[in-house]
Amino acid sequence: EADAVIYDRLVNPLLLFYCKPDCVFIYVGKTPYQSSMQQETINQLLLDTQKNHSKIVRLKGGTPEIFGRLTEELEVVSGNNIAFEIIPGVSSAGGSTAYNGIPLTERGQARAVTFMTAHLMMNEEVLLPEHSAEQTLCIYMGIEALPKLILQLVNQGFSANTKIAVIS
């Protein structure tokens, strides 16, 4: 039903085939460590697009409510009295771990989950949570910083034999 779809890099492009034939597609994907569209520009695009289109879909991949700038975009639409509806999907942390048979929590093993980002870790120290054998760490955007991240975890008391899964 959408007149326009504003979509990100992480969205499966096959989803766009479900749109009506005259739908307008606007790509606003961000690529790590490359020049990309700034969030302020995306926010303005949300406002500008609604002037010419009655039904807009903001299609985001990953988990928008976890390091995905959901708050910034909601402030723009709600602050401009634009009606919206959020239709959540499966979180990337929950979906990817379940698909790979990795429980985030497990009786007697992991009683807590911490979500954090390692995106800035290449340039600065990121404070990691205190070591706990009963905690699962879900570290988003950590591929580039993986060697530094592992070293920091070991330096903070995690065993070098701690099980990790890298999902990209």
What are the roles of these predicted feature ranges?
Residues 1-87, 95:
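Class I S-adenosyl-L-methionine
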Residues 41, 51-56, 69, 73-75, ...:
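A contiguous loop/helix-start segment that scaffolds small-molecule binding in enzyme catalytic cores
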Residues 9, 29, 88-90, 117-119, ...:
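Residues at the C-termini of beta-strands that transition into short coil/loop
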Residues 12-15, 93, 123, 146-147:
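Short, well-ordered alpha-helical microsegments
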Residues 61-134:
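Class I SAM-dependent methyltransferase SAM-binding "motif I" and its flanking Rossmann-like core
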Residues 16-17, 48, 104-106, 128-130, ...:
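Short secondary-structure boundary/capping segments
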